[in-house]
Amino acid sequence: MTKTFSAKPADVTHEWFVIDATDKVLGRVASEVALRLRGKHKAIYTPHVDTGDFIVIINAAQLRVTGAKPIDKVYYRHSGYPGGITATNFRDMQAKHPGRALEKAVKGMLPKGPLGYAMIKKLKVYGGAEHPHTAQQPKVLEL
């Protein structure tokens, strides 16, 4: 009788990957990144163990969306006070905080709870081409 394999946290190795997001579509990048942060691309994937890799995304300022979404896609946040809701569209979000739209998209695709919060911490997003993770020797990942 064979038993189902269950990965142990000590046995999992987390690799580093770098993705160039220049002229890539937001949703397609986000879904691939979420899959790799969870570790579903690995044979040792276990739902309750963090088996995912570290992902560094560069050039997030050049990320794009299709159609009329630069103006029509709206992000909401609320201060907690009555009437304290603010809305920002994708174009303004990219101009002010490049990469935040990608972070929000990926975060929505990850599980909610302690494991999901640990997974989102492995995502590093930078608007430009430079990143401070060269010491980890990230491998280039083509999407």
Swiss-Prot record:
It holds the Pfam family Ribosomal_L13. Signal peptide: none annotated. SUPFAM superfamilies: Ribosomal protein L13 (SSF52161). Part of the 50S ribosomal subunit. Belongs to the universal ribosomal protein uL13 family. This protein is one of the early assembly proteins of the 50S ribosomal subunit, although it is not seen to bind rRNA by itself. It is important during the early stages of 50S assembly. This is Large ribosomal subunit protein uL13. It comes from Variovorax paradoxus (strain S110). The lineage of its organism: Bacteria, Pseudomonadati, Pseudomonadota, Betaproteobacteria, Burkholderiales.
